[in-house]
Amino acid sequence: IYGGLILNATINLYAYCTIEETNDNKIVINSYDVCCHKIYPLAKCLDIDGEASLVKGVYNRIMRDYGLDAKSFKITTYNDAPAGSGLGTSSTMVVCVLKAFVEWFSLPLGDYELSRLAYEIERKDLGLSGGRQDQYAAAFGGFNYMEFLQNDLVIVNPLKIKRWIIDELEASMILYFTGASRSSAAIIDEQKKNTSQGNSAAIEAMHRIKQSARDMK
């Protein structure tokens, strides 16, 4: 309703994905960070059953949108950051896996298209609640001022920040993993509920966040 503004910075924790084409008429998924190993018969659509859902969601969407012939392959993924750490691990992995398929099939997707498709896969195809900035942050990287406008329009403005400012910022921050994880979906659902019901305190808080992004820029 009101649009959004975000000043986003990425860090040097990464998601990794490799795809190896095989000839055994199987699809093998290895996700080492979540201890998942699955083998499926070759198919153009894989059932979303709670196992390796992010990889399956990307694969199903690529097959459907681009009408590609199914090929047997082995895909291996790993994430530096723990799942549920609040660092956008799921969205980053979707972008990473999607980029791997884009490279494999030589698909014409730039950073904007990649981000938008990753968002649609995660939020619409898989039904995972969340925001929109994580996919764009993972695809673009660096420091970005993002504008979320009407009609799903997103504008990413890369920021040129002096090295000494980045060094000072890094020296002033500590990232610590408590060992506990949480689902961001429940938090996002609560925020959406509050704003859709016209909760004035929640809406005012969102406006203050937007203003903070303007001020930081």
Annotate the PLM regions.
Residues L13, L87-L107:
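DPxDG-like acidic metal-binding loop motif
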